[in-house]
Amino acid sequence: MGSENKNGKVPLISKIAYGFGDVGCNFSWMFVSNFLMIFYTDVFGISMAAVSALMLFSRFWDAINDPIVGGLTDKTKSRWGRYRPWLLVAAPITAILLVMTFWARPDWPQNGKIIYMVITYCLLVLGYTCVNIPYGTLCGAMTQDIDERAKINTSRSVAAMIAIGVLNIITVPLLSKFGSHSAKTGYLTVAVIYGCVFAACHFFCFAKTKEAVITPEKEKISVKVQLKAVMQNRPYLLALAGQILFGFTLYGRNADILYYFTYVEGNASYYTTYSMCIIIPSIIGAACFQPLFRKLNNKGRVASLFALFTGISMLSMFFFNAKESPAIFYALSGLTQFFFSGFNTAIYAIIPDCVEYGEWKTGLRNDGFQYAFISLGNKIGMAVGTALLAGLLGKYGYIANQTQNVIVLSIMKHAFTTIPGVFWIVTAVVLFFYRLNKKRYNEIVEELKNGRKS
C-alpha cells in the first residue's frame, strides 16, 4: 500500500486555514493576472511585443522548474511534513519578488526595462511555484476521505472568491489613492500591501494544517518513470487538459479585463462596479459545488456542468455593455461568475483523487510531481491566452493611454466575451468524460488500504 490515512476527518480550523492559503495566492497571482500586463504597457512603458514574448518565454522556464519543484516537495523530510515547510520559507521570498516586479522605472531605456521585466517576472513565477505546488498538493496529504476533500476545496474556493472580489473592488481605488501623483508609486504601494497579505495568509495556513496521509519511504524514481505513470492515469490527463483550457480562458480574459473597461467601455471605474456585482455570486457558486457533487457523485461531471453554463452566459455578454445596458450586463456578469466559481471548486477538488487512482493503477504515488504538471498546464494556458492577446493588440496598433482603433477595440471585446465563452464549452466537453465517481474512488482507497492493487 502506498499511503495510510490516520484521521479521515479534518478540523474546521484546518479547513479555514487551508482556505486562507488561497486568499494569499489570489492577493498575489490574481493581482498579477489582472494588472501586470497593463502595468507593463501603460505605466512601465514596455512594448506589447516584448510583453507577449515574455509570456511565452516564461512558460519554457516553468516547464523546467515546475516538475523540479514538484519532485523536491515529494522528497522533502521535516518534522512539519513534506509540503507545509515550503509555505513557511517560500512565501516571504515571493512577497518580496512581487514588490520588485511592480517597481516601475519608465525613465530607463527600453532594453533595460525588458531585461528587468524578464528577470523579476521569471523569479516571481519561480517563487509562486515554490508556494503554490506544495499548497495545492497539501490538500491530498490532509486526508483521503473524498467528502472531506470536497469540503476542504469548497473552503478554499469560497475563500478565494471572497479574496478575488475584495481585491477587484479595492485595487483600482487603491491605485488611484496611492498613485494620485504617480501611477508607478500607486502600483508599488499596492504590491507591498498585497505581498504582506500573501505571506501572512501562508503563515496561517502552515500553522493550522497537518499532513495526515503517510507515504512510506521509497527508492529514487526517475522522471521518465513518473511521466510514464502519469500517462496511464486517464482521470489525471483529463484534469490536466481541463487545467490548460482553464488557464487559457481565465487568464487571457483577466489580462484583457482592465483594457476592456478602460478602452471599450471608456471608463476604468466600471471595473470596480463589475467586481462588486460578482462577489456574492462568486461565494454562492463556490458553496454550491458540494451539494451538486452529493447529487451527481462525480466531480468531473459537476465541473463539466459549471463550465458549460459559464460559457453560455459569457457568450451572452457579447450582446450587452455596461454603458448602455448596465442591468443586463452586470446580471450576466454575476451569473457568469456564479458558474465559474462552481467550476473553480470542482476542478481543484478533482486533482487529489487522481493521485490515489494513479497509485492504484501504477503502484507509484507522486503527489507533488502530479500537481506540478497541473500547475504547468494552467500556466501554459495562461501563457497562450495572455501572449495571444498581447500579440494581437500589438499587431493591430494598440497605443497606450490613447483612443484605440476599431480592430483593437473589437479584439478587446471578443477577448472578454466570445473567445473565452467558446473555450469554456470545449472545457465542458472534455471534463464530461471524467469517469472516476465517488463509489469507484472509495473502492480504490479500500484496495490501497488493504494492500491490494487490481
Regions from the language model: what does each represent?
Residues 2-454:
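Membrane-embedded alpha-helical bundles of multi-pass transporters/translocases
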